[in-house]
Amino acid sequence: MPSVARGWWPRRAAAVLAALLLAALAACGDPASGREDVAPAGGQPEPRQGGGAAAAGPAGALAAYVERVKRAQAARAVAARKWGLKLTPLAAPPPPTAAEKPKITFRKGFGVGDPTLPPVFTTVPTKERIVFLTIDDGAEKDPELVRMMDELDIPYSAFLSDYLIREDYGYFKKMQRTGVALHNHTLNHRYMPALSYAEQKREICGQQDVIEKRYGTRPPLFRPPYGNYNGDTLRAARSCGVKAVPLWAAEAFPDHMEWREWDRDLHPGDIILTHFRGREDWKGSMADMIRYVMNVVTAKGYAVAKLEDYV
């Protein structure tokens, strides 16, 4: 879905027109499911019909934005049918402005005694019905995944380990060109708590250097292998520019989900983990995994948003 700068009109002005948006997007239909009520998760604003490009000020900007949303959702419905999804993925609400971004803090019980270190969290604090999709390591390099996600316009973030991606850095460059942010999953995917501070720093900061050299950006996010870390892990990560450490609330496979919480369900802001894997490791392909997780997410009334817009 196209991103739109949000600084030029207040979010509360959008809320005033939310009901009109729902009606407009309902007209788009849902070719993948046969339903007629396709609306964005969390509700999105819609101007009066017939305002046209001549409308000025916030209402005009809103009209242009919603028109783009409608076109994107119609294209997503076509892609959903092509890729075999049962339901058309919902459109995420507009991202927050920089001033509106939620404050990320340590999940309760996940701290290491120093609240100034990069926070470890599994869920982004939000009331929107959105979740975030993240893919780890880089073992499987399926070109179908890049095409599928680009055509479906579903955002995701990749957490990469150099020992797996070095055989084909170009694959992840193609992914990056579609808008995917590439983050740090260490050089060699070692168990961090068993390493000294110096060894952990080499693993984490070395991967920061690799990603910056190969892809032009120094990642602000880091995920430790297996989700295991200690105080040295976070101190080492902070020393080379890491701002936050997203773990996960659920994990996706081609045929099932695994859950962190007792209720075995999604919640607003949950981070979903999956891996770059194929039929050698899974009962299915990367595309099968995306079909499964997106059908679950959409059926539960959630949209996938871009993690970097909120963290």
Provide a role label for each language-model segment:
Residues 91-184, 188-191, 210:
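Active-site beta->alpha N-cap acidic-glycine motif
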Residues 131-135, 156-160, 181-186, 220-223, ...:
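Structural recognition of the beta-strand scaffold that forms the well-ordered cores
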Residues 117-125, 166, 282-311:
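C-terminal domain-boundary segment and adjacent tail
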Residues 33, 37, 46-50, 150, ...:
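CE4/NodB-like, metal-dependent polysaccharide N-deacetylase domain
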Residues 26-120:
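N-terminal low-complexity, Pro/Thr-rich disordered segments
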Residues 228, 233-265, 302-309:
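His/Asp/Glu-enriched short active-site or ligand-binding loop at hydrolase and phosphoryl-transfer sites
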Residues 138-141, 160-168, 191-198, 223-229, ...:
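Acidic-and-aromatic substrate-binding clefts and catalytic sites of carbohydrate-active enzymes
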Residues 1-37, 41:
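Secretory targeting and sorting signals
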